[in-house]
Amino acid sequence: MPVLHNRISNDALKAKMLAESEPRTTISFYKYFHIADPKATRDALYQLFTALNVFGRVYLAHEGINAQISVPASNVETFRAQLYAFDPALEGLRLNIALEDDGKSFWVLRMKVRDRIVADGIDDPHFDASNVGEYLQAAEVNAMLDDPDALFIDMRNHYEYEVGHFENALEIPADTFREQLPKAVEMMQAHKDKKIVMYCTGGIRCEKASAWMKHNGFNKVWHIEGGIIEYARKAREQGLPVRFIGKNFVFDERMGERISDEIIAHCHQCGAPCDSHTNCKNDGCHLLFIQCPVCAEKYKGCCSEICCEESALPPEEQRRRRAGRENGNKIFNKSRGRLNTTLGIPDPTE
C-alpha cells in the first residue's frame, strides 16, 4: 500500500530541497467544483503529486480544490497534462505562475481534506456559490480603475493590504476572510448603485466574495480573473500600465512578489520605508511583522528587545519560559494595535 503522507522531518526535507540543482516553478490554482469523495480524491492526487516531486500545500473539500505548489521545471508540462486528465472539471484550468520565483517556496507536500477550501463562515442554505460576478481582464481592470462609479474592494487580510494594493482600493478591516464577508456587505450598503470590483491574490477569495455580494442584493459585481498574480502578468505581457502598487504578499517562504517599485509600508519597529515581512527569530514568538535591515541587525531578527534577550538564552531556559505560554505564529496588526495568533505561515483560506 503506498504511503500517503510525509514521514521525513521538516528540517531534513528543507535541506534536501535547498540542495537540489534543478530549478522549480511555483504555481497556484483553484477550482470550485463538486468532489463527491474528497478523501479518495486527496489520496489519488497525493500519489500523482508525489510521483512528480511536487511540494506545497493543497486543500480539498466537497466544494473543490485549492493549491499552492512547487514543481520541478522539467515536470511542469507533465504535471499540467496529468492534472487536466485527472478530472473533466480540471481540464484547461488556469495555473497561476509566480511572478518572482527562486524555486524555494515549499519543501514538503501537505494535502488535507477540509470542510471548505476557503473558510467563509457561510451557513445560509440558499447561498449559491456558483452565482459569481463577472470576470475582469487586465485592460478592463485598468478601465475600471478610471471609472468614478467603480469601487475596488480588497478581499485580503490587513498584512497583505499593508504592503501592496490597487490604487484607491478599499480595505475591509478584518483579520480573516470569514469576518470580511459580512463587513463587506455592511460597508457597501450605501453604494449598491456603484460597480463593485473585488480582488485577492489568485482569485479564490474574491470569486466567492463576489457570489456573496450578489446573494446580498448587489447586482453590479466584478472580480479580477486570476487575482493580482494574473493581472500583473497579463498587464506586463500586453504592455499595459500596472496599477497595483507595492508588493503582492504570498503565502509561502517567499512572503512577497515585487509588483511595482513603490514601497508603501513601513518598518514596524522604526518606521522606515520597508515592505519585507519576517517572523520573529524567537521560537517562543514567531511574530509576523515588517522589519528593515537596520532593525534586523539591531534586534537580531527579533521583534523586540525582550524576544532578542530570550532568543539568546540557553535552549533549555527558552523551553522553560515557553512552557504554559501560548505559542505559535502571531501577526502584527498595525491598524488595530494588537496581535493575532495563528499557526504557521498565515493561511490565505482563513
Swiss-Prot record:
Keyword entries, A-Z: Oxidoreductase, tRNA processing
Class of the enzyme per the UniProt entry, highest EC level: oxidoreductase
Catalytic machinery residues: 200 (cysteine persulfide intermediate)
Source organism phylogeny: Bacteria, Pseudomonadati, Pseudomonadota, Gammaproteobacteria, Enterobacterales
Name of the encoding gene: trhO
Gene Ontology terms for molecular function: oxidoreductase activity, acting on paired donors, with incorporation or reduction of molecular oxygen
CDD domains assigned: RHOD_YceA
Task performed by this protein: Catalyzes oxygen-dependent 5-hydroxyuridine (ho5U) modification at position 34 in tRNAs, the first step in 5-carboxymethoxyuridine (cmo5U) biosynthesis. May be part of an alternate pathway, which is able to bypass cmo5U biogenesis in a subset of tRNAs under aerobic conditions.
Protein name: tRNA uridine(34) hydroxylase
Pfam families in UniProt: Rhodanese, Rhodanese_C, UPF0176_N
Protein family membership: Belongs to the TrhO family.
